[in-house]
Amino acid sequence: MTASTAPRALSSRLPWTHPLFWFAAISLAHVAMRLLASPALKWDEAEQILWTQELALGYGPQPPLYTWLQWAMNQVFGPSVLALSLLKHGLLALTYSLMYLAGRELLDERGAFWASASMVLMPALGWYSVRDQTHTILVTAMACGAWWLLLRIVRRPRPLDFALLGLVCGFGMLGKYSFALVAGAMLLAALS
């Protein structure tokens, strides 16, 4: 190791130099801002507080997974803006992290970071998800996870990745029924 590469090698081991650290930090900042902004609930948040009073196999037109996850958060933190915000922004951090991992299958670290970070430019993720969305965030995270696993399978097929892809697709369908479009598109792409 030369003197010119020593700082670079050291900095690559520091946690704050990794993109996943920043995705988590931004999500925690969003949680803090949501808690400071208002104790009032948005439409989807109020719906979750109502639905998480009991476990069911479905909630209105929505499949159950998001509400089950929210129920678990409420068991730990109580039915609160904190519990709602931690789940939502935790799933957003997971979404960006899974897209980063998918990007790493095709790009270098910098390219994968920008592929993931650029998702904030889509109004559905960059604005509406922070304001008031629930199931859409979960299905987007599962779509990013499925994309990452499919890319891993294409490059290095392993039984574990196939099992994980099946699990993620199952979670996607339990998160929002529109995941069927993602699964169908992935199947068509894999067959071509």
Residue ranges and their predicted role:
Residues 23-26, 115-124, 169, 173, ...:
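Short helix- or helix-capping micro-motifs
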Residues 64, 68, 78-97, 113-116, ...:
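Loop-to-helix entry region of an early transmembrane alpha helix in multi-pass inner-membrane enzymes
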Residues 34-48, 58-70, 78-83:
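Extracytoplasmic catalytic/substrate-binding loops of multi-pass membrane glycan-assembly enzymes
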Residues 1-30:
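Start-transfer (signal-anchor) and selected internal transmembrane alpha helices
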Residues 110, 146-164, 190-191:
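Membrane-interface transmembrane helices that cradle and orient dolichyl/undecaprenyl
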Residues 163-167, 173, 178-192:
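Transmembrane-embedded, aromatic-rich helix segments that form part
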Residues 86-107, 145-149:
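Transmembrane-helix motifs of polytopic, lipid-linked glycan transferases
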Residues 128-138:
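Short acidic/glycine- and proline-prone juxtamembrane loop motifs at membrane-interface regions
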